[in-house]
């Protein structure tokens, strides 16, 4: 809104032309969301603590984990999403369908996550709403959003699936694009949610993936760069860089409070929304497979849970001491800081591989 307001004065004040540059507004978006989260983080934590908005800890988890985490406020995703959305509303082009789709997914998944967090706090356990209700709600939200997006987006090849490393390998998914998009967005949302189990564990990988896609969305929306890199050019996609910048800034601000020992957890309010929004960005930029590479840590965490469940149902035995896999290493006696930093290193490597796919074709 602020961006569109300033455009009215470009002819009078020539220096305002700088706001037309996506890179400049991406930087503004990052620093705006960062500043907002840093400013409101402390008061929000005090408010949540005083109101006993505390995270119910799994009683079957590692003993050291239970002792350290008890009494920590949750629903910190409210802080993240507030900073993110205010920043995007200020510096994004709100007439852009891609930006609107990202905002829709973020708000919808955030509200669903907040409802889940509320139920956990209300009943003082880590169960919250049922898995069936959560997934069904995510599917319905995504179907509605992706249907409108496909209808209004100005890109005829939106249903194409592009493969990294192979410039001519393209599959037109047709109507299967909608269930595929649902799988990507819902899967991404729940994968980030599963990863958010240790202080700062999910936050840094989210920042890394958002950083990669800030670059990817910019070059995808630039006809010169997209032609040079031999990736699909999608008009208007560059605006998504501003959304990604807001994610980076708000998560950096949140990490200030979420770094070990965490003063607050993001809860499902943050993890479901951030995961869903990254999935949406992957769909918009037509880099869904690259999303799975850069967000490989999230994939690993989700797969570890699925493998654990399938193994137990088929054989009665568990492959891991506890799932998701970060709890397995906790059970083995690894210090929390060791697990978190090593998983961050994995995320950095995967992010570099994901970016390398843009050139290696």
Show the residue positions of the predicted features.
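Signature of the chorismate-utilizing enzyme
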Residues: 27-31, 63, 68-74, 79, ...
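Divalent metal-coordination and catalytic microenvironments
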Residues: 76, 117, 268
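Select subsegments of transmembrane alpha-helices in polytopic membrane proteins
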Residues: 69-81, 133-141, 336-346
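Cytosolic, membrane-interface loops and tails of multi-pass inner-membrane proteins
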Residues: 44-68, 118-129, 306-337
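Alpha-helical transmembrane segments and immediately membrane-proximal extracytoplasmic
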Residues: 55-74, 98, 214, 224-228
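Alpha-helical transmembrane segments within multi-pass membrane transporters and channels
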Residues: 111-118
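Alpha-helical transmembrane segments
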Residues: 2-43, 85-111, 145, 150-151, ...
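Membrane-interfacial loop-to-helix junctions in multi-pass inner-membrane proteins
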Residues: 95-103, 122-137
């Amino acid at each position: 809104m602020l961006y569109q307001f300033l455009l009215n004065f470009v002819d009078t004040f020539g220096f305002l032309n700088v706001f037309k540059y996506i890179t400049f507004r991406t930087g503004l978006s990052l620093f705006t969301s960062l500043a907002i989260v840093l400013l409101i983080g402390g008061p929000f934590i005090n408010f949540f603590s005083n109101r006993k908005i505390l995270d119910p800890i799994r009683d079957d988890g590692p003993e050291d984990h239970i002792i350290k985490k008890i009494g920590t406020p949750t629903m910190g995703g409210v802080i993240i999403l507030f900073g993110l959305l205010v920043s995007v509303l200020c510096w994004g082009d709100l007439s852009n369908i891609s930006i609107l789709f990202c905002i829709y997914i973020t708000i919808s998944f955030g509200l669903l996550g907040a409802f889940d967090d509320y139920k956990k706090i209300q009943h003082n356990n880590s169960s919250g709403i049922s898995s069936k209700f959560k997934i069904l709600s995510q599917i319905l939200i995504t179907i509605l959003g992706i249907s409108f997006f496909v209808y209004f987006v100005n890109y005829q090849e939106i249903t194409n699936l592009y493969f990294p490393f192979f410039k001519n390998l393209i599959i037109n998914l047709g109507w299967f694009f909608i269930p595929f998009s649902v799988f990507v967005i819902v899967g991404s949302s729940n994968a980030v949610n599963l990863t958010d189990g240790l202080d700062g564990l999910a936050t840094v990988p989210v920042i890394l993936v958002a950083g990669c896609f800030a670059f990817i969305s910019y070059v995808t929306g630039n006809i010169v760069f997209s032609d040079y890199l031999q990736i699909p050019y999608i008009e208007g996609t560059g605006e998504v860089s501003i959304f990604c910048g807001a994610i980076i800034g708000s998560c950096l601000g949140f990490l200030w409070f979420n770094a070990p020992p965490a003063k607050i957890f993001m809860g499902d309010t943050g993890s479901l929304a951030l995961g869903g929004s990254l999935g949406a960005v992957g769909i918009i930029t037509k880099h869904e497979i690259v999303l799975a590479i850069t967000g490989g840590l999230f994939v690993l965490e989700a797969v570890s849970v699925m493998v654990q469940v399938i193994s137990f149902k088929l054989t009665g035995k568990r492959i891991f001491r506890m799932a998701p896999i970060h709890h397995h290493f906790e059970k083995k006696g690894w210090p929390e800081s060791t697990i978190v930093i090593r998983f961050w290193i994995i995320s950095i490597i995967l992010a570099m591989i994901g970016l390398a796919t843009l050139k290696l074709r």
